[in-house]
Amino acid sequence: MTGLSYTEMEGCRNLLSLLDNDEIMALCDTITNRLVQPEDRQDAIRAILVYSQSVEELLRRRKVHREIIFKYLATQGVIIPPATEKHNLIQHAKDYWKKQLQPKLKETPEPVKTEDIRLSEQQEKEEKNAEKVDFRRLGEEFCQWFFELLNSQNPLLGPPQDEWGPQHFWHDVKLRFYYNTSEQNVIDYHGAEIVSLRLLSLVKEEYLFLSPNLDSHGQKYAASPHGLVMVGVAGTVHRGNTCLGIFEQIFGLIRCPFVENTWKIKFINLRIIGESSLAPGRLMKPAITFEPSDLEAFYNVNTLCGPVKYNSM
């Protein structure tokens, strides 16, 4: 798992953009031991960031030339003597990224009565807006969008309809992946890059197709007073013309305060059960099991991964 913070990852992404394509591909081969075969430049950069254990490990690579780090710092307004050695340039880059969060803290105003009034008015406005949200419609539209986008990344279905990536997730998103096929396992993934890549690999490398059950039994919705919306959906898992089993997926969504009518994924619980683990001789239609009362526990610990109910078709 990557050791880069979100700020370091974004900084390194901009720095790597200064390398040419051959250098990017060569660096990707070195870092991943040629175990990852990127389709293009952006795939290679994602792999470099994901598999780098630290900023030092990445920037000390011979393929990341001293001149590149110097040029990046110059574009960010960090003026350093041209003769500065590479290890000092790396430290300057690390220091620069650490400072990116500090201005936000300093800009926070001191609590005064007028500010309290503005905050109170803003909170009241947000609460009124929250009351206007149709969570059922939001959940239905989200599920349709999410699964169409994810499934479109399956190379067996032709070119993707839109770009998949970490931009659809909060940077500290969590994914809990439980699968019961030939073996049982639960694996946790953290961070937008890691989570987006793991979900992408299901359809792009394992050629799976997730078909959600969008009727009343296959979906449930709930919302917390803090603005978190929980969307649950069940469905079947396919590869080509073969049905491999069923899945249950629960999303936690939070509205993006900077972009109107935009929600991002805060956490996901994904449970896949292989056909061999289902009762033989029955066609099963999965149904979501969580109730609105489960929301508080799910919101606090994000560990709900209970058994799936089945309804005979």
Curated annotation (Swiss-Prot):
Xref: SUPFAM superfamilies: NTF2-like
InterPro entries: NTF2-like_dom_sf, UPF_C3orf38
Keyword Zinc: no
BP terms from Gene Ontology: apoptotic process
Record region (Disordered): 105-125
Cross-referenced Pfam families: DUF4518
Keyword tags: Apoptosis
Keyword set includes Metal-binding: no
Origin: domain of life: Eukaryota
Function: May be involved in apoptosis regulation.
Protein name: Uncharacterized protein C3orf38 homolog
